[in-house]
Amino acid sequence: MPSSQISHQDPELGQTSSGSSSIKEKAEPQLYAGPIDPARRPDVFQEGFEDVSVTDDDNDNELLRKMGYQPVLHRSFEFFESFAASFASLDVVSGVRLTFSWGISFGGPAAYWSAMLVTGFCSIVTAACLAEICSALPAAGSIYLWAAESAGPRFGRFVSFLVAWWSTTAWTTFVASITQSTANFIFAEVSTFNNPWPTNDSDVKFRAVQWIVAEVLLVFTILLNQVPPRYYKWIFKASMLLMFIDYVMNIIWVPVATSKKPDGFRSAKWVFTETIYDQAGYIKEVDDANGNPIASLSKIVPKGWQWCLSYFATAGVIVGYDASGHIAEETKDASIKAARGIFYSTVTSFIVAFSLAILYLFCCPDLDTFTAILYNDNSPQPFVNFYSYLLGRGGHVVMNVVIILEIFLNGVVSVLACSRLVFAVSRDGVLPFSNWISQVSKTGQPKNAITVIYIVSALLLCTILPSAVAFTSLVSAAGAPSFAAYAVLAFCRLFITRDKFPKGRWSLGWLSKPCLVITLVYNLFALVVNVSPYTYPVTGPSFNYAVVIMGGVSIFAIICTIVIPKSRWVANRYRYESDSEHSASVKELKV
């Protein structure tokens, strides 16, 4: 092992790699984000290390040291902040609005509500599996470290690199998509008030303005993440308050307004049994240059697959609940509170999402009006038109202001979770420029990781300029890598470390393996749906680039696994070396 990698100072003993030592009563605060000396790192697979949990807040940092890391982040979050991190990142109140028209277009109301029900159940099961893992390994970056442990000594390094790149891609694209959706809700007011200024995504001039506004919103989102950690609690509270107000306004105001419309509510039969197969190309007639129908392009999307595509509108809403795990190093009694944050935020999100989906279905206008409103090409966010139809111009503006502020603050929370993931991955040497990215400020803030998120998200927003379906691709790219990572975790725990994985205080017991099977099957299915095309026939401008992003990121992960020396990969390093290599490294440490 190169001496440059072992020359850091042990904060407990005050001893350097040169062999000199100074006895200290108390170690000075360290901002070094790297691991403890490898010779001191325990192997979590060794006997006597199965339970890595603690029962006292004061032992949180000791638990982190047992996992091999120096505690450098500011630990101040309680269960509320852990819950809010995932709940705000999911933001299903906004998510249902963003994808509602897609859910109806693929299979109709029957497909949409049933897909939401299945998605909710499977997401809760997946969250339970992640919570069990988080309880055993509550560290920043969570899912990346969990992958290393789940894949075992033989495959851990490769799988962790793959999941690290997938997860960082998912969260950075998620940040970009949030800022763009915020801009869409702003510009939707233009078409609502019949302003002649074009707001059609096919207009490149509008996309240029849309891009500028999204970039500005991203800057403010990043700036709010530069505040000292003690102020984050207020951001969490403000975000939760706005989501509560938004939800209450919807469940009270929307049905009251619907009852005053001539058509009133839709029937239960329409909501629960109606199918619609005319939006994704099933009976769409495609003409040639002479205006004659092209038979080969008629009925190009089978009904069964259209039904499956409705899961894009539901699975993409309830994903990202690993956020509580990303801030585990800043959460007190994390082995319990972070795990509960993952699970209960997902349960609550499903209840909110399902209730809103059913509410909106009952409040839908007749099909012609519905099509004119929610498939309005002149509005970047047609759901604003739906509110305008129900609540009137004045009422819908109030609702839209709450929505815009809510999405913006949830973007701030998402950057918080994402920055902890990027920090954790870089401190283990997985990303390029890891030494710089993993540096932490005096206030325990990974500011360089936040800067990296800004740069990547800003570049991703540039896809708005050439593509009219960039937003759809960003949403898919935000969900697809997460589904892939969840599936890989379940696969590894089922087939590689099924009886070896460390146990935490939050456990599923005998239900663990059945839940892992459900997690694996569901997330593989959701992955396929999220990378598939949505507009037919598929052309360059309408292509879903999520599959390209996933493929490119996977290639980068494989290249990094090959190029980056094994000695630079810090997490559980000695689990991947032979006994002779381990002994030689320990001997070098003692020289």
UniProtKB/Swiss-Prot annotation:
Domain of life, per lineage: Eukaryota
Region (Disordered): 1-42
Bias kind Polar residues: ranges: 1-22
GO biological process, one term: thiamine import across plasma membrane
Pfam families, sorted: AA_permease_2 (PF13520)
PTM sites of type Phosphoserine: 585
Example GO molecular function: gamma-aminobutyric acid transmembrane transporter activity
Membrane topology: Multi-pass membrane protein
Keyword Nucleus recorded: no
GO terms for cellular component: endoplasmic reticulum; endoplasmic reticulum membrane; medial membrane band; plasma membrane; plasma membrane of cell tip
UniProt subcellular location: Endoplasmic reticulum membrane; Cell membrane
Alphabetical keyword list: Amino-acid transport, Cell membrane, Endoplasmic reticulum, Membrane, Phosphoprotein, Transmembrane, Transmembrane helix, Transport
Transmembrane segments: 98-118, 342-362, 397-417, 450-470, 545-565
Similarity comment: Belongs to the amino acid-polyamine-organocation (APC) superfamily.
Functional description taken from the UniProt entry: Thiamine transporter involved in the cellular uptake of thiamine. Pyrithiamine, oxythiamine, amprolium, and the thiazole part of thiamine have been shown to be also substrates of thi9.
PANTHER family: AMINO-ACID PERMEASE BAT1, THIAMINE TRANSPORTER THI9
Official protein name in the record: Thiamine transporter thi9
Source organism of the structure: Schizosaccharomyces pombe (strain 972 / ATCC 24843) (Fission yeast)
Gene behind the chain: thi9
